[in-house]
Regions:
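Condensing-enzyme catalytic core mediating Claisen C-C bond formation in acyl metabolism
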Residues: 1-27, 151-166, 240-311, 319-320, ...
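N-terminal extracellular/periplasmic Venus flytrap/periplasmic-binding protein-like
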Residues: 13-15, 25-35, 43, 156, ...
Length: 425
């Protein structure tokens, strides 16, 4: 059996994240991902190199994006002989792409690879009416011009109504925010705790920018030099003034302030074998040790939509002989402040850990001072497929700065899924 190799995280690059319909309103997925890729090429002197592979993806895609990642490679200064493919696992896309590339490096199939993702809600795909689509296909199948005209004469004004992207789970009809509101009610997560976590995210990220932390993590794009969702002057008073966004009654606790906004952006990470990195004189910030994905039955199983990482982490810990407390940093994606707090509360709940996770004892509490120490999605924003790359690069840099340590990544995703990983130095 092939001896598995350690997978080095060499570094990352992203463009600043932007709130939807802002600076990137006219930027396509391809333009943003290519910009992030070009920045990575420049940072690590990859010009003209044939990379093992590039794996990336987007949650919201136009039909023109059917070969998105490969087109970005062809539009970059990488060798055109670099293979590339698309990945999509909702908000877990970027991290899942990194795990796919890492597995090939570990097995010796490739020496290096690039992984990440991109998303835009500003340039969201708007489809043709389903009735119009079927009529056009029927007309295309018709043999004669007369038959084609007969079909096209069935067109009516309602066929011109466009098909807009839906903000809801197909199986339930509820938005992610509505699902998370139900989770917050189930786990009795107070509004004040959610607002406090949101405030800490903004404060931590503002401090990181002030110290120049992001200088080697991103490259400017379309005039933007930092994430424009960041609010350095945010306060609990400002957060408390916001109205509930998903539940209008007095039960509502999720607001625009403690939930991530719709965001545009792209991110990538460069991975490689130790030998490849050293041969090229590239840094090794940390190592991607292992990953685990999970899914829950949020439709019929009485489980919260965004609780899958709660299930993935204990499997990951057991396989690696670790406990939840064996980490120096915790990077938990802040889709909503309530999701993070539900996750932490579930791991501390003995009955839940026994009946749902099959554990003899609860995983326990974490040291909150180690959680999202440079800020996370509530401050940066959340371009769905791009969040994983941002988190991997940020955590690897944290471990490199510390000189040692171990970090845990947890990312919830639509469809009741979650992707988790361990990074160590």
């Amino acid at each position: 059996m092939t001896q598995l190799r350690r997978v080095a995280i060499i570094g990352g690059n992203r463009i600043p994240f932007a709130r939807s319909n802002g600076p990137y309103a006219t930027a396509s997925n391809q333009a943003m991902l290519t910009a992030a890729l070009e920045g990575l090429i420049e940072r690590f002197n990859l010009h003209g190199l044939r990379i093992g592979e590039v794996a990336a993806g987007a949650v919201l895609k136009h039909s023109r994006d059917f070969n998105l990642t490969r087109e970005c490679v062809l539009g970059s200064r990488l060798s055109p002989q670099t293979p590339a493919y698309d990945v999509q696992q909702a908000c877990g896309t970027g991290l899942e792409a990194a795990l796919l590339v890492a597995n090939k490096i570990a097995l010796g199939q490739i020496e290096c690879g690039i992984a990440g993702g991109v998303d835009t809600t500003s340039d969201a795909p708007i489809g043709v009416n389903e009735g119009l689509r079927k009529l056009l296909l029927q007309a295309n199948r018709s043999k004669s011009m007369a038959d084609k005209l007969k079909v096209l004469l069935q067109l009516r004004p309602h066929h011109l109504k466009p098909q807009l992207p839906r903000n809801g789970e197909p199986r339930t009809g509820l938005s992610m925010g509505q699902h998370c509101e139900l989770m917050a009610q189930t786990w009795q997560i107070p509004r004040a705790e959610q607002d406090q976590l949101a405030l800490e995210s903004h404060r931590n990220m503002a401090a990181a920018y002030a110290e120049g932390w992001h200088n080697d993590l991103l490259t400017p794009f379309l005039g933007l030099t930092r994430d424009n969702n960041l609010r350095p002057d945010l306060s609990l008073e400002k957060l408390a003034a916001l109205k509930p966004a998903f539940e209008r009654s007095e039960k509502g606790t999720l607001t625009a302030g403690n939930s991530t906004p719709l965001t545009d952006g792209a991110s990538l990470v460069l991975l490689g074998s130790e030998a490849w990195a050293r041969e090229r004189g590239l840094p090794i910030l940390a190592y991607l040790r292992d990953g685990e994905a999970a899914a829950v039955d949020f439709v019929n199983g009485a489980e919260g939509l965004l609780m899958a990482p709660v299930y993935a982490v204990p499997r990951l810990l057991a396989r690696n002989g670790l406990t939840l407390q064996d980490f120096d940093y915790y990077e938990i994606h802040e889709a909503f402040a309530a999701q993070v707090l539900c996750t932490l509360k579930a791991w501390e709940d003995a009955d839940y850990c026994k009946t749902r996770l099959g554990l003899e004892a609860p995983l326990g509490a974490i040291d909150r001072s180690r959680l999202n120490v440079k800020g996370s999605s509530l401050a940066a924003g959340h371009p769905f497929a791009a969040t994983g790359g941002r988190i991997v690069a940020n955590l690897a840099k944290l471990l490199d700065a510390a000189g040692k340590g171990r970090g845990l990544i947890s990312i919830c995703a639509a469809g009741g899924q979650g992707v988790t990983a361990i990074i160590e130095r």
